[in-house]
Structures are given as C-alpha cells and as structure tokens.
From Swiss-Prot:
Official protein name in the record: Small ribosomal subunit protein uS11
CC per GO annotation: ribonucleoprotein complex; ribosome
InterPro entries reported in the protein's UniProt record: Ribosomal_uS11, Ribosomal_uS11_bac-type, Ribosomal_uS11_CS, Ribosomal_uS11_sf
Organism: Desulfovibrio desulfuricans (strain ATCC 27774 / DSM 6949 / MB)
Signal sequence region: none
Family, per entry: Belongs to the universal ribosomal protein uS11 family.
Pfam families registered for this protein in UniProt: Ribosomal_S11
Subunit: Part of the 30S ribosomal subunit. Interacts with proteins S7 and S18. Binds to IF-3.
Record's function text: Located on the platform of the 30S subunit, it bridges several disparate RNA helices of the 16S rRNA. Forms part of the Shine-Dalgarno cleft in the 70S ribosome.
Length: 129
C-alpha cells in the first residue's frame, strides 16, 4: 500500500536589513558567511564552492567571486548594510572586502579578528622549496 506523501513546507526567506559578513581567509581557501546580528547564518560561499580547485582556491580572484556570490544571496534576503569581520592571513582578504562593497552593500565597519597567540602552539616548520 502506498504511503501518503509528506507535506514539505517551503523555506521562508528572512528579511534581514542589517548583518555581519565574516571573511575567513586561510592560505588554502576563503570562506565568506553573512549572518544576522545574532550570528545566525543567512548565506555563505567559499572559493571551493564557487568552482575553483586546488591552488586556485587561494587566489584573490577566487575570493572575489565567492564574496560576490554570498553577497548576492544575502541581498536576496534583504540585507543592505553589513559590518565586516576579517580573520586569517590569506590572500583573499582585501579582494573579498572590495567585492562586498562593490556589490552595493553599505559597509558599516571593518574589524580584524585574527587570533594572535601569546606564544601558544609551535608553528609549522618553514618550507624549503
């Protein structure tokens, strides 16, 4: 006997006029997440998700494309003003910030939240190429 079909509710879009853009730029990838002011994710994108593979993920252009994608999704949810938190030493930091402001979003503030150790873990040894 056939089971009755489950009724699936369509995900309703949140209207979030003010939010926060978190840019996490590592040496290998750049991840951009747009959240509301309480920290709930509204949209996100990364260099890898945007179609870049391998060493091309760490380029500024890949970060720019990812930031444009995430900003477009956030604007669909009504986001107009953002504060930017940047974390990490990656090459995509500046490109991602520029792409967010170029997408038509008003940037309220930019804050660097890169964790700096007070002589914590031993860093990886230097590469000899």
């Amino acid at each position: 006997m056939a089971r009755p079909k489950k009724v699936v509710k369509k995900k309703e879009k949140k209207s979030v006029p003010v939010g926060i853009a978190h840019i996490q730029a590592s040496f290998n990838n750049t991840i951009i997440t747009f959240t509301d002011t309480r920290g709930n994710a509204v949209s996100w994108a990364s260099s890898g998700q945007s179609g870049f593979k391998g060493s091309r993920k760490s380029t500024p252009f890949a970060a720019q494309v990812a930031a444009e994608t995430a900003a477009r999704k956030a604007q669909d949810n009504g986001m107009r003003t953002v504060g930017i938190y940047v974390q990490g030493p990656g090459s995509g930091r500046e490109a991602a910030m520029r792409a967010i402001s170029a997408a038509g979003m008003k940037v309220a503030f930019i804050r660097d939240v890169t964790p700096i150790p007070h002589n914590g873990c031993r860093p990886p040894k230097r590469r000899r190429v």
